[in-house]
């Protein structure tokens, strides 16, 4: 499963195509609903079985994941778009209110979590953004040489976050 922000979709597809990686693009038939917030896990756990953090599980034709990060705990729900409204109605009938992407951005900004395409780009690495914990331990990956050099030399820019006391 590969989920990217809509603004990065073409870039990701180009990368996959250039590297001859086979994939099935389900963008037009699949929806993603992120259920996040203070009581999200407690509320959604009343009618679905929640996976462990950083894992996924499939029930019928719905995939549940706890792989996102926004500053609040939650679960991402991937389902066929013909089933989306029924699922949204189920959420609402269980006390979970809908909100937009602006809410997600507010949560992640309050938690100082960068978003690829905005605070993270081709020019800003995870090391520079203070996200070294997200880097794989595999022997080889795209950008490994740059990452290794930044970790070793410590001579790189640092993305800094500020908390305003207002």
Language-model features: locations:
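Conserved, structured C-terminal
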Residues: 1-166
């Amino acid at each position: 499963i590969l989920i990217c922000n809509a603004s990065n979709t073409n870039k990701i597809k180009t990368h996959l195509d250039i590297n001859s990686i086979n994939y099935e693009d389900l963008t037009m038939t699949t929806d993603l609903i992120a259920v996040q917030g203070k009581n999200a896990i407690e509320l959604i756990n009343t009618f679905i079985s929640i996976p462990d953090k950083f894992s996924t599980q499939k029930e019928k034709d719905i995939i549940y994941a706890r792989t996102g990060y926004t500053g609040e705990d939650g679960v991402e729900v991937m389902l066929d778009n013909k089933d989306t409204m029924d699922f949204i109605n189920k959420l609402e009938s269980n006390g979970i209110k809908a909100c937009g992407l602006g809410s997600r951005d507010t949560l992640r900004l309050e938690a100082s979590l960068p978003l690829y395409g905005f605070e993270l780009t081709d020019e800003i690495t995870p090391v520079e953004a203070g996200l070294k914990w997200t880097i794989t331990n595999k022997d080889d990956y795209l950008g490994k040489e740059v990452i290794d050099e930044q970790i070793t030399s410590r001579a790189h820019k640092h993305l800094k976050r500020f908390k305003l006391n207002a």
